[in-house]
Regions:
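Alpha/beta catalytic cores of group-transfer enzymes, especially the acyltransferase/condensing modules
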Residues: 2-150
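N-terminal entry module detector
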Residues: 1-4, 206-208
Length: 208
């Protein structure tokens, strides 16, 4: 958001800190967790959620879906997924049921924080990971930020949207290659690069 000119760096930091504080409060008020389901499609995952009470939190790829919910619902979802033939159905080591309804206690506080900051229209289009669409106005960005708290992350559709929009090169900034691997699984023709240390920053700058 700061790079795109939507928020100043100081306001972006304020938003990150307040969002984290509010989410921790929601975790304390409504404990839960997340689980990875690998090898089942979205339709089957939706059925598992209806039967268990869990919710879809992130659709990483067509065959990798993250569920969130209270601990009882998640345990039930893992059992159902295993019975349905999932390659893996495992709990994740996280502190809460992120991107699900269990984060709703943080919603009013986040909305107030967003409303208090000075948002500008993006200098370049952003892509929302809830709507999987371009965000070109400050109001669209604010709506996306509000929805992200309790809505499923549509990573699979987000990457597909970027590919359909002519984006061919993907850069993962930070340590690790998890997102790069997901992009490759979504479309093997995508060009992915990692910028995770000072040397890779210099290499990118020299090729830019």
């Amino acid at each position: 958001l700061a790079v795109a000119g939507v928020l100043s760096i100081s306001d972006a930091v304020k938003l990150v800190l307040e969002r984290g504080r509010l989410m921790q409060g929601a975790c304390d008020e409504r404990p839960g967790g997340m689980a990875a389901i690998i090898g089942l499609d979205e339709v089957t995952a939706e059925e598992i959620c209806r039967e268990s009470g869990a919710q879809m939190s992130t659709i990483n790829t067509e065959q990798q879906i993250i569920l969130a919910g209270d601990h009882h619902s998640l345990a039930m979802a893992i059992d159902i997924a295993s019975a349905r033939g999932a390659k893996k159905a495992i709990p994740l080591q996280v502190g809460g049921a992120f991107h699900s309804g269990l984060m709703s206690p943080a919603q009013n506080g986040l909305n107030a924080m967003i409303d208090s900051l000075d948002f500008q229209d993006p200098l370049v289009p952003l892509i929302g990971n809830v709507t999987a669409q371009s965000l070109t106005t400050s109001e669209q960005v604010k709506d996306e930020l509000r929805m992200q708290l309790t809505s499923c992350v549509q990573w699979n559709n987000t990457v597909k949207f970027m590919l359909s929009d002519g984006i061919e090169n993907f850069y993962e900034i930070g340590h690790g290659k998890v997102l790069s691997g997901m992009v490759k699984r979504i479309n093997r023709r995508a060009n992915v690069s990692n910028i995770g240390d000072f040397e890779s920053v210099l290499a990118y700058a020299s090729n830019g």
